[in-house]
Amino acid sequence: MDRAALEEGARKILLTNLRQGVADWNGQAYSFVCPSLTGYPFQWFWDSCFHAIALLHLDKEQSKAELRTLMSAALPNGFMPHLLFWEMEKQPDFLSRNIVGQAGDPHYSSTMQPPIIAYAVERVYRATGDEEFRKAALPVLVNFYRWLRDVRDPDNDGLIAVIQPEEAGTDCSPKYDEALGLTEMSNRGVLAA
């Protein structure tokens, strides 16, 4: 496959999976690329970070919109959830097939994913030179990384504590089976993805 065909394939997937609208639950506009229209129709933290970087080659404005939408969900304490249910009507079906940690608010998860958002913001800023984007992002990022330091580094060793496998980006890894009480499933030859 040549580069032009690869770029066209990426463009088709990214723009087909673009979700835009206004959330019924908070009246906020959203614009993001979902990982899958059928299986994963919501906004995921690190997927959005990678989508924003990929979108730099296709649509720089959408690249910024992707991260703005993600950062708009940051809580006052700095926490940024790994999953945002902008379209709540799709949530019941998804939750019937998936386990998502939720505490309190049903519109987002109570867990996080690898904190790569600063890297994504930097890449988008360097590609666009958009000072307003950078200025708006910095307070959100500072608050998020302070939250990580204050809440997710209980022993002050500079390492973030992982509460469940998705937070490390190693979803469904067998290395967590014992800790999660799934030892009976470990050697059944089942591949879960």
Which ranges hold each PLM region?
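Charge-dense, low-complexity intrinsically disordered segments
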Residues: M1-A4, T38, H57, K135, ...
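Low-complexity, Ser/Thr/Pro/Gly-enriched N-terminal "stalk/linker" regions
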Residues: M1-Q43, K64-A65, T69, G78-L83
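Hydrophobic core segments within long, regular secondary-structure runs in both alpha-
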Residues: R3-R11, L15, K60-M71, A118, ...
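The feature captures the catalytic groove of carbohydrate-active enzymes
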Residues: L37-T38, F42, H82-I116, E122-R126, ...
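Hydrophobic (often cysteine-bearing) scaffold residues that line and stabilize catalytic clefts
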Residues: D47, Q113, A137
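Alpha-helical scaffold segments that form or flank carboxylate-/histidine-based iron centers
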Residues: D47-F50, E132-R134, N143
